[in-house]
Amino acid sequence: GLPRYLLASGDLEQARELWPFLKWCLEYCHRKLNADGVPESDTDELEGRFPAGKANLSTACLYYDGLVSATHLAPLMGEPASVTRTYRRQATELKAAVERYFGGTVSGYDTYKYYDGNDVLRSWICLPLCFGINDRAKGTLDALFSPLMMTEDGILTQQGSTTFWDRSTLYALRGAFAAGHSDEAVKQLSHYSQRRLLGTHVPYPVEAYPEGSQRHLSAESGLFCRVITEGLFGIRPTGFNSFSLKTQLPSGWDRMALRHIKAFASDFDIEAVRVSPTKIKVTVSKAGGKTKEYVVMPGQLISVTLN
């Protein structure tokens, strides 16, 4: 999260202040790698509420994405090229280790074991999809959206339980969009929005159930926004004034737009319009700056520099 935030903020001084802490965290995780190449961790996102083993998929994926973002941030911090190469190599090796260590068949689905020895589906198998690891995208989404995991209130934390946390449902929706499964994702997002924002428990996403009795937390509302920004529009910071776009326009939509995005020390719009069955036109307009247009296939990667 930190390198994504620093890049998107466009604040060089803040990045210089926090870069040493980020480097420390990356080195700490690197020193925690086990013989199989994945980081060991005595806890995870759920802080011991459910089993996580000695090495879990959540920690591994978060570390992986931190390395990827660090390859963009390191040159801006004046680091030698060798540092960027090291982070890139470590990310490549970790991605392969995630597949070897966690990849497998669970409850008949070609997806991920949350930890070594895990034999039931877990909600956080969605995380690889959020970070561009799509080798098992179809099987993972089939599992998450199956009756074994999907309920009226979102995705269960663990197959066979009655516990749900909105954050994993929101990450799964973001991952579904990011992996190119936009039609299924928008269907599930529509149901979620009707249930949460317009239904019996309004007007925000909730934290969990039964713990906390569905109280509201601002973090979940932030994750809802990230379904749109990082999932549907596929925005990924690559510099203080640059980002990549991987726009996923659902087949039933003719257009979509985000207006007045405040990021990269700028104010800009992104609009996607369908121009043919296989092409969309993406327009990026910066207030007081240039307008750029791209005609691409849905999900095609675009590199944007704001100027």
PLM region spans:
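Short, tandemly repeated low-complexity microdomains enriched for cysteine and small residues
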Residues: 241-244
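Beta-rich accessory regions
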Residues: 80, 86-89, 93, 101, ...
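Short, conserved phosphate-binding/catalytic loop or strand-edge motifs used
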Residues: 43-47
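Active-site core of glycosidic bond-cleaving carbohydrate-active enzymes
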Residues: 8, 13-27, 48, 52-85, ...
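Acidic, glycine-anchored loop motifs typical of Ca2+
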Residues: 37-39
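Short, well-ordered surface patches within globular domains
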Residues: 96
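Hydrophobic/aromatic-rich effector regions of fungal transcription factors
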Residues: 1-8
